[in-house]
């Protein structure tokens, strides 16, 4: 969905909202693509947080190198 959204998105601050409005109103099923993308991203981050919670529960933070790599990956995902 991100590739389809990126095809219609404009990063210019004066046109960004207009490009989202164009996508939702003028692109066929643009509203559906936008909603699928938003819900999919939310579900992805919920899965990430559950994975972190599982690591905390089972004490994976004791393995410092692996835990630090996981923290770096989490920060990279959020950037």
Curated annotation (Swiss-Prot):
Lineage, top-rank taxon, reads Eukaryota
Q: Which UniProt keywords apply?
A: Electron transport, Heme, Iron, Membrane, Metal-binding, Mitochondrion, Mitochondrion inner membrane, Respiratory chain, Transmembrane, Transmembrane helix, Transport, Ubiquinone
The subcellular location is:
Mitochondrion inner membrane
- Show the Gene3D superfamilies listed in the entry: Cytochrome Bc1 Complex, Chain C
Q: Which residues of the sequence carry a binding annotation for heme b b562?
A: 37
Biological process GO terms, please? Answer: mitochondrial electron transport, ubiquinol to cytochrome c
Q: Which GO terms describe its cellular component?
A: mitochondrial inner membrane
Q: Return the Pfam families for the record.
A: Cytochrome_B (PF00033)
Which residues are heme b b566-binding? Answer: 51
As for membrane topology, the entry says:
Multi-pass membrane protein
Q: Name one GO molecular function term.
A: ubiquinol-cytochrome-c reductase activity
Q: How is the cofactor bound?
A: Binds 2 heme b groups non-covalently.
Name the needed cofactors: heme b
Locate the transmembrane regions by residue number. Answer: 1-7, 31-52, 67-79
Coarse class of the primary localization is: mitochondrion
SUPFAM superfamilies for the chain = Transmembrane di-heme cytochromes
Function summary: Component of the ubiquinol-cytochrome c reductase complex (complex III or cytochrome b-c1 complex) that is part of the mitochondrial respiratory chain. The b-c1 complex mediates electron transfer from ubiquinol to cytochrome c. Contributes to the generation of a proton gradient across the mitochondrial membrane that is then used for ATP synthesis.
**More info:** Heme 1 (or BL or b562) is low-potential and absorbs at about 562 nm, and heme 2 (or BH or b566) is high-potential and absorbs at about 566 nm.
Report quaternary structure and partners: The cytochrome bc1 complex contains 11 subunits: 3 respiratory subunits (MT-CYB, CYC1 and UQCRFS1), 2 core proteins (UQCRC1 and UQCRC2) and 6 low-molecular weight proteins (UQCRH/QCR6, UQCRB/QCR7, UQCRQ/QCR8, UQCR10/QCR9, UQCR11/QCR10 and a cleavage product of UQCRFS1). This cytochrome bc1 complex then forms a dimer.
Family the UniProt entry places it in: Belongs to the cytochrome b family.
Q: What is this protein called?
A: Cytochrome b
């Amino acid at each position: 969905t991100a590739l389809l959204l990126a095809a219609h998105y404009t990063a210019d601050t004066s046109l960004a909202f207009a490009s989202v409005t164009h996508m939702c109103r003028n692109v066929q099923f643009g509203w559906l693509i936008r909603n699928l993308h938003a819900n999919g991203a939310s579900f992805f981050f919920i899965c990430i947080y559950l994975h972190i919670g599982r690591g905390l529960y089972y004490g994976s933070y004791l393995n410092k190198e692996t835990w630090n790599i996981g923290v770096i990956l989490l920060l990279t995902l959020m950037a």
